[in-house]
Amino acid sequence: MLLMIINGEGHILGRLASVVSKKLLEGEEVIVLNAEKILITGSKEWAYGKYKQRIDRASISNPRRMGPKYPRRPDDIFRRTVRGMLPYKKSKGREAFKGLKAYVGIPREFKDEEMVEIPDAKAGSIKKGMELGEISELLGARLQIGSVIMKKVIHTSGKRKTAIARGTIREGKGRVRINKVPVELYTPELARLKIMEPLKLAGDVINDVDINVRVVGGGIVGQAEAARMVIARGLVDWTSDMDLKEKFVQYDRTMLVGDPRRSEPKKYGGRGARARRQKSYR
């Protein structure tokens, strides 16, 4: 069986995955190194949004469901991309997929091996793009490449009525800020207590992270619930702890899945949103 070792640095993800999938179907074994340096063309905002949406995809009606799963690491993202180009639901595709291996960096056993490049898959001079390693860092993956450790960062968002919140969670000392204000000083008290609910449920987990939340629009309670959702979702993503997720759901499922309900405005011709003045013919 033929073996091909490819240096993924400077290759475009889709083009390289297309070539690799064809080689696998022909019965070859393929090893891809430097997976974190494979490029995705397009703007950073688009690329991050695309993969974040895949990771966040879940059943809204049943948040305790564990799938579908999508990888965060660059080597696993590449493998998943190749898998999508194979007839994976058939035995032929599954057997071919077993011949693919991808690595972050260059492992010691491949230091002295001859690596090839795929000219048709090289990036050339693209104007917009980012490496899989950058995507993985934004998605929260923690990788060690040589002596460099990619720091784990989690980005989350939440919404309640017209309030929209976005937050970032990274390693820290338990500092939580809402619109640059420490949560302990956030006013009014009703909103502060609402925001701190997931922090109290999470327990000691909060001592090892810093959380920054930016919330705009809506009213006091709407902003508080949007910020609460950002914190709860972020802690679940950070810990990957299904017990913590279950705890949030049991306490209040709207921490994770949102609440579309809102007060319907009053309209003319009646005492309320739906009530109408009744006309009597007697």
UniProtKB/Swiss-Prot annotation:
Disulfide bonds: none annotated. Residues 259-282 are annotated as: Disordered. Residues 1-141 are annotated as: Large ribosomal subunit protein uL13. GO terms for molecular function: RNA binding; structural constituent of ribosome. Keywords: Ribonucleoprotein, Ribosomal protein. GO terms for biological process: maturation of SSU-rRNA from tricistronic rRNA transcript (SSU-rRNA, 5.8S rRNA, LSU-rRNA); translation. In the N-terminal section; belongs to the universal ribosomal protein uL13 family. In the C-terminal section; belongs to the universal ribosomal protein uS9 family. HAMAP family: Ribosomal_uL13, Ribosomal_uS9_A. L13 protein is one of the early assembly proteins of the 50S ribosomal subunit, although it is not seen to bind rRNA by itself. It is important during the early stages of 50S assembly. This is Fused uL13/uS9 ribosomal subunit protein. It comes from Methanothermobacter thermautotrophicus (strain ATCC 29096 / DSM 1053 / JCM 10044 / NBRC 100330 / Delta H) (Methanobacterium thermoautotrophicum). The lineage of its organism: Archaea, Methanobacteriati, Methanobacteriota, Methanomada group, Methanobacteria.
